[in-house]
């Protein structure tokens, strides 16, 4: 018992909320299993602590016989025949109308909760095996965001930057070293270099979407319904319109049960009428779950498409990084304006050198898809201000590593600025009277 309790606590702690995911992931692996656990608890309380079924027997029968019949009918399944139809004499026809799901509802809900947790377990195992410390980075970023002192925050961001760069370098190993195992070859292949964890996370998103859709098949298979997803809408429509179960047959409350009694070497068959009280709760629970699964399927699918676009479309990645670079550049320019009164509109003193081809190389060759993924994770949990400082430091790191290209760009920029300045001087000389208006 102690081992099972420890195992359960370990499983729950392993699925606790962490920083290496988003809100949609938490709806799937954390909040949905909680909802299913509550539903399972409510149904189990009625099923094992209350009276899930009551059967009408001969008033002259003993109480022990009544308890036996109710236990037998609960275990052996019951069947539903509309009140306006005759009960068929053929026992095979009765078996075809059997209702055999009500005993297994708690176990079905537990299985569904485990299925919602599987993609999360897959993601965390792969994230751990990849070597990227995404969770550590996000926790450090959240701690840095909480710091009020500017110098302490800067030191924390610099430490995060060093760790971030180490993670990026880990995803781009030296190509001259040949990997021996086939797993290492796949992980360090040129195609997957820098985007391995992004592919894994996108695949995890796909697993969440597939799992939600699979729940409709599972529920209908358990309820033996051929109406697929519209069965849930039909149940909701019946509840809303006030149509009784006696007309629809959805989650019937009154069913029939056949049992046999051996008496004096003879086998006597009896039919009793039973009230399935548990189906009152089952109807409300499954109707709610259908609504929740439909909403969750839409949200999860949209989230999957969103992450696919932002992780693998180059223009989206460039625009995302450019936003933070422009914010950092604007912030530095405003700081310079406080001390440099002659700072011109052309931003001659700009700290972050900007060039389109260098930005493309920064995104595709330095950050890559995995770096963009980590930046988005940090932004989701620690806020954009930390990401602005982090991107600024990463840009400076990239600038130091590619100083030759930046020097060439600065030289071209100086030549262009001298040409513009010379043009202005010629304009002033040609129109000396206009200079008075600027004095």
From Swiss-Prot:
It comes from Caenorhabditis briggsae. It comes from the Eukaryota. It is found in: Cell membrane; Cell junction, Gap junction. The keyword Transmembrane helix applies. The chain crosses the membrane at residues 33-53, 103-123, 199-219, 285-305. Belongs to the pannexin family. It holds the Pfam family Innexin. It is a multi-pass membrane protein. GO terms for cellular component: gap junction; plasma membrane. GO terms for molecular function: gap junction channel activity; gap junction hemi-channel activity. This is Innexin-19.
């Amino acid at each position: 018992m102690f081992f099972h309790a420890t195992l359960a606590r370990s499983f729950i702690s392993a699925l606790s909320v962490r920083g290496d995911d988003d809100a949609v992931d938490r709806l799937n692996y954390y909040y949905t299993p909680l909802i299913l656990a509550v539903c399972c608890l409510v149904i189990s309380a009625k099923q094992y602590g209350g009276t899930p079924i009551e059967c009408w027997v001969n008033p002259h029968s003993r109480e022990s016989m009544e308890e036996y019949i109710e236990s037998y009918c609960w275990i052996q399944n019951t069947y539903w025949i509309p009140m306006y139809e005759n009960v068929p004499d053929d026992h095979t026809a009765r078996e075809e109308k059997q209702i055999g799901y009500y005993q297994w509802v708690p176990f079905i809900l537990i299985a569904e909760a485990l299925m919602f947790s599987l993609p999360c377990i897959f993601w965390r195992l792969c994230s751990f095996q990849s070597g990227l410390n995404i969770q550590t980075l996000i926790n450090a970023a959240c701690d840095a965001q909480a710091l009020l002192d500017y110098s302490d925050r800067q030191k924390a961001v610099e430490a995060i930057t060093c760790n971030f760069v180490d993670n990026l370098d880990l995803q781009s190993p030296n190509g001259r070293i040949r990997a021996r195992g086939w797993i290492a070859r796949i992980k360090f292949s040129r195609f997957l270099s820098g985007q391995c964890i992004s592919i894994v996370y996108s695949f995890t998103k796909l697993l969440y979407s597939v799992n939600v859709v699979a729940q409709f098949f599972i529920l209908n298979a358990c309820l033996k319904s051929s109406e697929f997803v519209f069965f849930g809408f039909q149940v909701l429509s019946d509840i809303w319109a006030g149509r009784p179960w006696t007309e629809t047959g959805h989650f019937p409350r009154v069913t029939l049960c056949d049992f046999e009694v051996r008496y004096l070497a003879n086998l006597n068959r009896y039919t009793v009428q039973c009230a399935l009280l548990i189906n009152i709760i089952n109807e409300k629970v499954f109707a709610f779950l259908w609504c929740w699964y439909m909403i969750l399927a839409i949200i999860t699918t949209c989230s999957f498409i969103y992450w696919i676009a932002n992780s693998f479309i180059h223009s989206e990645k460039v625009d995302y990084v450019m936003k933070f670079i422009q914010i950092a550049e604007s912030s530095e320019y405003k700081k310079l304006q406080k001390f440099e009164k002659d700072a011109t509109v052309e931003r001659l003193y700009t700290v972050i050198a900007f060039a389109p081809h260098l930005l493309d190389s920064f995104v595709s060759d330095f950050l890559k898809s995995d770096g963009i993924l980590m930046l988005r994770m940090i932004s989701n949990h620690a806020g954009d201000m930390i990401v602005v400082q982090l991107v600024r430091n990463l840009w400076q790191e990239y600038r130091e590593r590619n100083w030759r290209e930046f020097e060439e760009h600065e030289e071209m920029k100086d030549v262009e600025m001298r040409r513009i300045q010379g043009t202005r001087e010629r304009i002033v000389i040609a129109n000396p009277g206009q200079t008075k208006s600027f004095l």
